[in-house]
């Protein structure tokens, strides 16, 4: 049997390369999607938002004592905070950082310098109010919860989310080294504390263990390696701890006796104190947390949401359950068995540690007692008992030491515990340093780098089961980030209240999480785009679809691999990446068909398509990348994360979406199979292939242009006099744009919750757009001339007017009290969308004419008129696709628990639609009209002439474009 046609080596190589690239592309899409669905760095995706208002005292301490908002305001030792606005700015920045570190990336924060609702609260003393209110910040963020995985009722789920929100925001991260009874040796607000010195140690060699280090400046000129421990003990003794549990009593004498937490001698009869220090990372947060647990009413929705540990803590505080026995280790109950803690304010910073644990007492002189037996002796009644302390866990006995014990809850607030001394052999012997202090003051790790004279190192962190383990680098770095962005010095949280903003989303598909359903929506969007591209452009569309899928999946995979959190911000960003890639791919496809309709062959059409789109695509992607890098540099937290995703997407879009598609198509077109028009064209377009006129080529020379290229006149003339009435509209919008910009700069609060979580990020987006736009203007002036530059400038101002107007309009129309939608990020994303459209118009208009600038006014009008008559349909499709994408996304996140709708999803569709209108039409129409009007003034002379060239007959017929009927029809 013979084949009618032999396959050439060229054909085999090209088709083999194509199949290899296609297989690799499909593998990348499938493997990348699988990896994303199994990724551990998945954030909340519209699981229902909560809004929490945190109230702060208007006063600050003048004598370094802590202020308690549940007690009557003292008459001395306090003063008013003078600059509330600046104070709240610091609080805002700290919250933006801490919530981002905790994994809440959809965060919005608003401020109120005098919140009158504080007067309605019953858990703060009214003497603290100033003019009937208190300063406050209101935080809205998404929480990750799946109701399908629990049997709890809706009210229990809601209560759990509210409590989670409270515990997430009632933090005041501040490093503090204290005695067990709350005497502060130093904290991170101390003038001698070197805040910049807090560092997470990078693991060395094969170890994965990290540590936290920081420096302090003792009141001594030089601290040597030999005097290190002695100097630190002298520093402790200088704090006048003679009456502290550190030096006297049985370790917890301050909370024993009548009217106190524990019975007399509950911790033994020793008299040398406990010699224990506690390193807190958030003691104020711990106090708020324990008080909130105490305030929960038994049997309430909040009570029913307690986990095992929280319920154990509640029972301890109320002397109920397993803590109602009257054991002298526990609470000093009265005759009726009631707890000595009558109200939340009875729990203070001074006695908080003793709820967590009972410190083991210190014996000044060692004895011959059985240390191990004594260590297990809960009562420690014999003052001669010596308890061996070799690590931080030995310094205390947990109040509940089992795996579900409540003491483990304190790992969110305590970093470490340090015993400073060990018993000596006999009275008068030199001080013996305990191993925990030796580790805390590692003599081999005293390289001072930040201006202190003593360096501390914490190599073991308190864990959730009450034990101590070495932290990994991520854990240490997280603590470091939280501690280096604290509240302002004067900040004291008064109280907080929270509520659900919208009904939480239920699983939209059985046993599928919200993230998975969102990812399914993402997959369907890519699939629909692939089908439509294939239907429109046949084989070209199929290759483009593969490149599109590989590009967007790679963007998310790489983003996740470098530490990004894949959440609602990521999905919003990647949907814009899809829409922008569609603009570029549609542009390539329509240029190809335009060449075909102009009687060029398939091969020549594709070559011209690449030639005339390469630089425009390169310019746009460079602009995209630079803008993302600028926003990364100028912004913080989730906005910075979004910019990271966009920077990655700029690279993957160019090399995968644009690069892979043109490689695949070029290889196939240049193969023998590329001559088969049925693989590329429908019969309507293929008819143009039979109209090839001759073997002539138009080459640049010195003859003048004619205007007879336009054989037919378009139905719509954008240069009619009536259309110039739009100039009046443009002038009004330009004025509005200036007003909007001034409003943003002067009164950003008018945008309310739709700004970013912190001021720097909002300003970073605006500055980034402005800087990159100015750079692009300077580039355009050199490359395209004055007409293009002025057209872009006016269009850009119109765009800004529209985008800012939409932000204000949206804030007014939807009247959302709080939302996790940050409209300021949409300004950046739609600016990118606009830039992609400008790139498309540039390719469509300028590059099609081989870089030459034209000066014949009639010709220019006809050229721009023809281009815009053809391009508006493509613009409409591209703009509609963005809204369509968000409709699909919303459909897969539709609904809510008990049938209540989450309207945030539908607000999102409307918001995208409004922004889309502001971006798609008037600015682009203005760009074309002004550019066409001004182009005759670009006096760069370039002429054409015909040059006859003899060629063997081929399908390639290089002729200049003649704008014949139907050439630009979509």
Curated annotation (Swiss-Prot):
Keyword entries, A-Z: Cell membrane, Membrane, Transmembrane, Transmembrane helix
Keyword match Membrane: yes
Membrane topology: Multi-pass membrane protein
Transmembrane segment boundaries: 11-31, 515-535, 537-557, 558-578, 614-634, 645-665, 726-746, 762-782, 789-809, 816-836, 877-897, 903-923
Start-end of Low complexity biased regions: 367-387
Region (Disordered): 366-387
Superkingdom of source: Bacteria
GO terms for cellular component: plasma membrane
Localisation per UniProt entry: Cell membrane
Signal sequence bounds: none
Protein name as annotated: Uncharacterized protein MG277
Highest classification ranks of the organism: Bacteria, Bacillati, Mycoplasmatota, Mycoplasmoidales, Mycoplasmoidaceae
């Amino acid at each position: 049997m013979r084949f009618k046609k032999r396959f050439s080596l060229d054909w085999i190589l090209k088709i083999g390369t194509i199949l290899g690239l296609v297989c690799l592309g499909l593998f990348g899409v499938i493997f990348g999607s699988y990896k994303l669905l199994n990724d551990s760095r998945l954030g909340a995706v519209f699981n229902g938002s909560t809004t929490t208002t945190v109230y702060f005292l208007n006063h600050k301490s003048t004598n370094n004592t802590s202020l308690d908002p549940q007690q009557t305001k003292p008459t001395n030792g306090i003063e008013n905070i003078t600059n509330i606005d600046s104070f709240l700015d610091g609080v805002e920045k700290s919250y933006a950082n801490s919530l981002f570190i905790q994994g809440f990336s959809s965060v919005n924060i608003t401020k109120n310098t005098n919140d009158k609702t504080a007067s309605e609260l019953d858990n703060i003393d009214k003497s603290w109010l100033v003019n009937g209110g208190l300063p406050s910040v209101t935080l809205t963020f998404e929480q990750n919860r799946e109701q399908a995985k629990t049997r709890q009722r809706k009210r229990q789920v809601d209560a759990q989310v509210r409590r989670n929100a409270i515990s997430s925001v009632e933090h005041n991260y501040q490093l503090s080294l204290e005695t067990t009874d709350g005497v502060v040796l130093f904290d991170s607000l101390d003038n001698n504390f070197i805040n910049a010195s807090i560092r997470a140690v990078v693991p060395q060699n094969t170890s994965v263990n990290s540590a936290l280090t920081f420096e302090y400046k003792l009141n001594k000129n030089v601290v040597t390696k030999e005097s290190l421990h002695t100097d630190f003990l002298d520093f402790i003794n200088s704090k006048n701890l003679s009456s502290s549990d550190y030096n006297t009593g049985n370790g917890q004498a301050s909370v024993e006796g009548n009217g106190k937490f524990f019975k007399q001698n509950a911790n033994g009869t020793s008299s040398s104190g406990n010699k224990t220090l506690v390193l807190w990372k958030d003691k104020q947060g711990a106090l708020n947390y324990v008080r909130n647990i105490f305030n929960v009413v038994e049997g309430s929705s909040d009570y029913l949401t307690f986990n095992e540990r929280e319920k154990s803590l509640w029972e301890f505080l109320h002397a109920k359950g397993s803590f109602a026995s009257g054991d002298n280790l526990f609470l000093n109950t009265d005759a009726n068995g009631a707890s000595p803690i009558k109200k939340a304010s009875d729990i203070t910073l001074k006695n908080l540690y003793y709820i967590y644990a009972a410190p083991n007492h210190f014996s000044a002189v060692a004895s011959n007692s059985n240390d191990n037996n004594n260590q297990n002796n809960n009562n420690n009644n014999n003052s001669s008992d010596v308890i061996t302390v070799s690590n931080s866990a030995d310094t205390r006995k947990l109040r509940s030491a089992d795996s579900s014990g409540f003491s483990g809850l304190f790992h969110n607030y305590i970093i470490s515990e340090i015993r400073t001394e060990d018993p000596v052999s006999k009275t008068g012997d030199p001080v013996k340093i305990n191993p925990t202090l030796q580790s805390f003051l590692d003599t081999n790790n005293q390289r001072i780098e930040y201006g202190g004279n003593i360096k501390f190192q914490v190599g073991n962190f308190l864990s959730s089961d009450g034990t101590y383990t070495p932290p990994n680098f991520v854990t240490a770095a997280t603590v470091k980030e939280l501690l280096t962005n604290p509240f302002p010095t004067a900040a004291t949280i008064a109280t907080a209240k929270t509520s659900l903003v919208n009904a939480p989303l239920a699983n939209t598909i059985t046993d599928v999480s919200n993230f998975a359903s969102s990812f399914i929506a993402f997959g369907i969007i890519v699939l629909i785009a692939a089908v439509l591209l294939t239907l429109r452009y046949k084989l070209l569309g199929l290759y483009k679809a593969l490149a599109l899928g590989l590009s967007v999946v790679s963007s998310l995979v790489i983003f996740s691999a470098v530490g990004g959190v894949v959440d609602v911000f990521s999905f919003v960003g990647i949907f814009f990446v899809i829409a922008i890639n569609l603009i570029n791919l549609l542009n390539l496809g329509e240029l190809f068909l335009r060449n075909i309709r102009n009687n060029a062959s398939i091969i020549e059409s594709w070559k011209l398509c690449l030639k005339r789109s390469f630089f425009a695509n390169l310019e746009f992607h460079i602009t995209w990348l630079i803008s993302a890098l600028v926003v990364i540099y100028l912004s913080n937290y989730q906005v910075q994360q979004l910019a990271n995703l966009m920077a990655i997407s700029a690279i993957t879009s160019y090399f995968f979406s644009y690069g892979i598609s043109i490689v695949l198509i070029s290889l196939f077109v240049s193969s023998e199979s590329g001559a088969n028009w049925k693989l590329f064209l429908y019969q309507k377009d293929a008819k143009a292939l039979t109209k090839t006129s001759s073997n002539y080529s138009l080459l640049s020379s010195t003859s003048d242009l004619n205007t007879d290229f336009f054989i037919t006149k378009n139905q719509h003339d954008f240069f009619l006099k009536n259309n110039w009435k739009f100039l009046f509209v443009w002038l009004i919008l330009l004025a509005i744009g200036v007003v909007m910009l001034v409003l943003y700069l002067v009164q950003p609060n008018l945008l309310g919750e739709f700004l970013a979580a912190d001021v720097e990020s909002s300003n970073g987006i605006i500055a980034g757009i402005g800087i990159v736009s100015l750079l692009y203007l300077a580039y355009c002036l050199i490359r395209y001339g004055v007409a293009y530059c002025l057209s872009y400038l006016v269009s850009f101002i119109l765009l800004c007017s529209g985008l800012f107007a939409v932000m204000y309009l949206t804030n007014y129309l939807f009247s959302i009290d709080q939302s996790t939608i940050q409209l300021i990020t949409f300004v950046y994303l739609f600016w990118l969308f606009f830039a992609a459209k400008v790139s498309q118009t540039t390719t469509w208009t300028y590059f099609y004419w081989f870089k030459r600038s034209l000066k014949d006014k009639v010709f220019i009008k006809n050229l721009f008129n023809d281009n815009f008559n053809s391009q508006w349909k493509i613009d409409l499709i591209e703009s509609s696709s963005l809204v369509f994408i968000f409709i699909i996304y919303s459909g897969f996140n539709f609904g809510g628990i008990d049938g209540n709708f989450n309207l945030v999803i539908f607000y999102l569709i409307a918001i995208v639609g409004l922004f889309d209108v502001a971006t798609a039409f008037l600015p682009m129409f203005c760009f074309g009209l002004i550019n066409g009007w001004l182009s005759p003034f670009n006096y760069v002379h370039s002429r054409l002439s015909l040059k006859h060239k003899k060629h063997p007959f081929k399908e390639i017929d290089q002729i200049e474009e003649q704008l014949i009927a139907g050439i630009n029809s979509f």
